[in-house]
């Protein structure tokens, strides 16, 4: 198998991003590679489980980012600083923003303790969007945290209220790897779920958080903006930029990708003039205008690249290979570490990137094909 083909298989095997969506729209060729994927994931799983048994698994990394605020790095498959949550504390309330996947529940609870709090005192779980890497643990957490109420956009609520279809679809794709990757995916009881929309104000943990609707990456995406501190919790609307790597990558999974809506969401966030963005993948961004300019350019240029390949009659697998070869050199120059490619693949992988763009062009702009 070529290096490029191997990367594609790895990316398919580690489709963390938006699995609740992809499980319902997964193309046939993804499933046809199941044997190769299973072999790769089996090796990865065994290495990961050996680390757990030996006690060498990286621990959660809890960092205080300001008064009453902590950043939590989950050790997802042994890799830190790829998936993050945020903890807010104040006025006898504890709020978690994007609690992460179900496989990281114990990591999250231990991180809250490490920050000096009792997880049983968590009162609010705020969801930027309901993709499993951000919100997969919500249903499990409300069963363990008696005071916690979940807040999500109305378009994301059905995915949390009933996860039966999501679990069944994802299980067909991941099989025995399902629990390792995502843990338990439990439904959230209706009485423990509150609906939020753009324009709402949440007075939580001593903060006044504005809710802004920011579709583009997902139709159920919102951000939370603290006007007084200037902190904006951005989910995935600000893209992916891992720590110590000056490289922005667009996470464009199906089925909700909408480039026009995303551009409008970027303009909205910039108009708020936040002092810092806290993103899910991963951490703080302070050069906000430059960051969004790069993201907007990448969203457009990668989309045009995929469109050009579709016009040339290329199939999905070939377009994935082409996009990898087209974009990999820039990431390597920015990271100076080949391992950065795999880390970015965990956060958002090439197959889903291409699938998202292909669906977007076919659904939104068939006249350009």
Which positions does each model-derived feature cover?
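Low-acidity, Ser/Thr- and Arg-rich intrinsically disordered low-complexity segments
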Residues: 2-6, 10-21, 26, 39-45
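Conserved beta-strand hairpin/beta-sheet module of binuclear metal-dependent hydrolase folds
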Residues: 59-115, 224-234
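Metallo-beta-lactamase
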Residues: 64, 101-103, 159-213, 219-289
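Residue-level marker for buried hydrophobic side chains located in beta-strands
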Residues: 95, 126, 150, 231-233, ...
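Active-site metal-binding motif and surrounding structural segment of the metallo-beta-lactamase
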Residues: 106-152
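Histidine/acidic-residue-rich catalytic or RNA/ligand-binding cores of hydrolases
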Residues: 288-297
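C-terminal regulatory/interaction regions
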Residues: 305-369
């Amino acid at each position: 198998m070529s290096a490029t083909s191997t990367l594609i298989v790895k990316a398919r095997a580690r489709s963390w991003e938006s699995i609740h969506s992809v499980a319902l729209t997964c193309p046939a060729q993804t499933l046809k590679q199941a044997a190769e994927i299973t072999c790769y994931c089996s090796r990865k799983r065994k290495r990961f489980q050996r680390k757990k048994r030996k006690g060498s698994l990286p621990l959660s990394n809890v960092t205080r980012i300001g008064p009453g605020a902590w950043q939590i790095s989950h050790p997802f498959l042994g890799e830190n600083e790829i998936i993050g949550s945020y903890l807010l504390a104040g006025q006898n309330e504890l709020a978690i923003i994007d609690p992460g996947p179900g496989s990281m529940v114990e990591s999250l609870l231990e991180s809250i303790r490490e920050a000096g709090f009792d997880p049983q005192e968590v009162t609010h779980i705020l969801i930027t969007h309901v993709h499993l890497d951000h919100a997969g643990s919500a249903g499990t957490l409300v069963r363990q945290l008696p005071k916690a109420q979940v807040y999500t956009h109305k378009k994301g609520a059905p995915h949390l209220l009933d996860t039966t279809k999501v679990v069944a679809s994802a299980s067909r794709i991941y099989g025995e790897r399902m629990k390792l990757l995502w843990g338990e995916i439990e439904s959230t009881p209706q009485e423990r779920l509150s609906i939020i929309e753009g324009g709402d104000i949440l007075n939580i943990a001593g903060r006044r958080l504005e809710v802004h609707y920011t579709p583009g990456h997902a139709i159920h995406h919102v951000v939370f903006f603290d006007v007084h501190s200037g902190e904006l919790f951005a989910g995935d609307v600000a893209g992916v930029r891992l720590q110590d790597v000056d490289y922005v990558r667009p996470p464009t999974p199906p089925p909700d990708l909408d480039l026009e809506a995303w551009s409008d969401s970027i303009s909205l966030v910039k108009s708020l003039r936040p002092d810092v963005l806290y993103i899910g993948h991963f951490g703080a961004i302070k050069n906000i205008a430059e960051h969004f300019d790069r993201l907007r350019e990448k969203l457009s240029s990668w989309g045009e690249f995929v469109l050009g390949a579709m016009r040339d009659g290329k199939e999905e697998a070939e377009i994935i290979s082409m996009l990898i070869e087209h974009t990999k050199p820039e990431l390597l120059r920015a990271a100076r570490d080949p391992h950065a490619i795999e880390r970015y693949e965990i956060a958002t992988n090439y197959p889903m990137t291409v699938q998202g763009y292909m669906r977007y062009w076919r659904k939104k702009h068939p006249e350009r094909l």
